[in-house]
């Protein structure tokens, strides 16, 4: 009964109801879309950087005069429950055969048995070199092309994606090949990468590394990539909630619109309310009737707004961020729907209460 009466009353002033409905749709779409956008950003970061969360990078502390690590430092770290990967690094010009030009690049040297732990999906031999996507695109080279370093030719054996471990414009050689170019007796490493199989041991390994290498003085800087990811995700989460809060302002405006519609309805339906009260309708019945009207507006507007947010969220995440919708999209849609319905009901409380307080005799006398 309540539902049918509420539906009839909303149809009576259809244009006014549609305008109130639009406010809810826009508000819910804004809240959900901004939440989905934040979720998409986190998803994109995890897709691009999640593969490096198991790594710790150890750099020399240049401020204290340390520029490299030696064999003794490496051996000290072998006791840790992780894979210790010493890395050579320098910058130099390489000659691109067939292009008749040189290119400047960051060159890394890693033991060929350690490369498999770096999730680069390349296999490098002592006669080959791997290049990152940036170097490949800028210099128009691909697998099979030849690079020349120190007048020695190396075949490009693979292309890997740049990460925090190996930034843009980089090449990877085996440690043996690197020493061939930059000193056979060169065992001074520019950095150390620690691969921790169990991500839950990251903090423990980081602390143990600090105790081993920084026991006497600050010899190195230790960076946990997992902690960087957590910090980035934390910032994005806070920004997402802030943006959702801004979106909630439009929902507040929509709530005011619904309250206004309901108050006007009370004035217009004074006689009708008086008739209902005179034939036995209680104050509770009047309140429930108005809340049903608000509920219908809230449910319809929230559902439309939520699905619009899913549509626009997909377009933004897929085409702009180049990633996929996360499972959080449903969560933000539900949050938007709940807020939309609650806003509608809360906005109708005062008009419903005012309608229930109308004196039936005075209402009929006005007619």
Swiss-Prot record:
Membrane topology field: Multi-pass membrane protein
Any single Pfam family the record assigns to this protein: FtsX
Ranges that cross the membrane: 18-38, 239-259, 296-316, 329-349
GO molecular function: transmembrane transporter activity
Entries under InterPro entries matching the protein: ABC3_permease_C, MacB_PCD, Macrolide_Exporter_MacB
Any one of the GO CC terms: plasma membrane
Localization per record: Cell membrane
Signal peptide range: none
UniProt keyword annotations, A-Z: Cell membrane, Membrane, Transmembrane, Transmembrane helix, Transport
Organism domain of life: Archaea
Main location: membrane
UniProt similarity note: Belongs to the ABC-4 integral membrane protein family.
Cross-referenced PANTHER family: ABC TRANSPORTER PERMEASE YTRF, MEMBRANE COMPONENT OF TRANSPORTER-RELATED
Protein name: Uncharacterized ABC transporter permease MJ0797
Taxonomy of the source species: Archaea, Methanobacteriati, Methanobacteriota, Methanomada group, Methanococci
């Amino acid at each position: 009964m309540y539902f049918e009466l509420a539906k009839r009353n909303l149809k009576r002033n259809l244009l006014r109801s549609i305008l109130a409905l639009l406010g809810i749709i826009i508000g819910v779409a804004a809240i959900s879309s901004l939440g989905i956008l934040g979720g998409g950003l986190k998803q994109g970061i995890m897709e691009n950087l999640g593969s490096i969360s198991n790594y710790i990078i150890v750099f020399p502390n240049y401020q204290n005069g340390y520029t490299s690590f030696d064999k003794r430092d490496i051996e000290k770290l072998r006791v840790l429950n992780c894979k210790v990967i010493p890395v050579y690094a320098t910058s130099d010009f390489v000659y691109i055969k067939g292009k008749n030009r040189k290119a400047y690049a960051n060159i890394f040297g890693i033991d060929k048995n350690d490369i498999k732990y770096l999730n680069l999906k390349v296999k490098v031999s002592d006669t080959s070199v791997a290049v990152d996507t940036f170097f490949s695109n800028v210099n128009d080279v691909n697998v099979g092309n030849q690079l020349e370093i120190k007048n020695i030719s190396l075949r490009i054996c693979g292309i890997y994606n740049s990460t925090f471990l190996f930034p843009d414009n980089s090449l990877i050689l085996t440690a043996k090949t690197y020493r061939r170019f930059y000193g056979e007796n060169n065992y001074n490493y520019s950095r150390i990468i620690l691969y921790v199989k169990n991500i839950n041991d990251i903090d423990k390994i980081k602390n143990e590394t600090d105790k081993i290498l920084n026991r006497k003085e600050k010899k190195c800087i230790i960076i946990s990539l997992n902690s960087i990811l957590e910090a980035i995700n934390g910032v994005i989460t806070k920004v997402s909630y802030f943006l959702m809060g801004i979106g909630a302002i439009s929902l507040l405006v929509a709530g005011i619109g619904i309250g206004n519609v309901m108050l006007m309805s009370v004035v217009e339906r004074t006689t009708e309310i008086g008739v209902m009260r005179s034939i036995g309708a209680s104050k509770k019945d009047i309140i429930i009737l108005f809340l049903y009207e608000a509920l219908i507006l809230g449910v319809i507007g929230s559902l439309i707004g939520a699905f619009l947010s899913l549509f626009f969220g997909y377009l933004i995440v897929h085409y702009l961020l180049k990633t996929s919708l996360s499972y959080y999209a449903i969560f933000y849609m539900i949050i938007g729907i709940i807020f939309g319905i609650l806003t509608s009901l809360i906005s109708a409380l005062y008009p419903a209460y005012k309608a229930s307080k109308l004196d039936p005799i005075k209402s009929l006398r006005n007619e």
